[in-house]
């Protein structure tokens, strides 16, 4: 990712724990990374061939320090493609690692799927630096876009944009800093940057039932089909039931 490309890795089970340090580094360095976690029964080696949704809390919170990440969950075998595209777009445009949750049920599942045309998908626009710096001006790698709080992405070898990244805290100029006030500022900016990703997400839509009613069922991930079936079956008894699938 430091060299100017999206970094992607996949894992399952305790492999996610082993990658937590690298994810923290990507959060601190603010570089695009997608981690795909095909969840299985745990803990430890657990049930390698059986499905589970037990990694959600680790995906949301399983890193040291204040280390927020975007998390997306696929809900069907076909949806894995769109979820992966969304994860890549978020990572590249917001300069952040993203966790994509799948699970054994989806990994071993199948369904008819029409291969899409990429022209039907929105353009991905990474925040690469453009042009050259004015004479005497130094590149400040952690200065942010005022709307998105995303930093600019300078590639190694770009003249005038030399800078350092790494796991140590830095200020906006990219200089190492242990100043408490600067640390508080950078922690807050990184968290708010991730929170503002929600501005670019589509509005949630009702998958079944009326837009309002007495009962709302919320689910996530591969339980989508089961929940949808259950809501449809109880629809005769609970006429105001609705289903919405929320991607964390």
Language model segments and positions:
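Short capping/connector residues at structural and topological boundaries
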Residues: 21, 61-64, 110-111, 118
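Flexible, low-complexity linker and terminal segments
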Residues: 83, 88-248
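Thiamine diphosphate
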Residues: 1-61, 70-91, 236
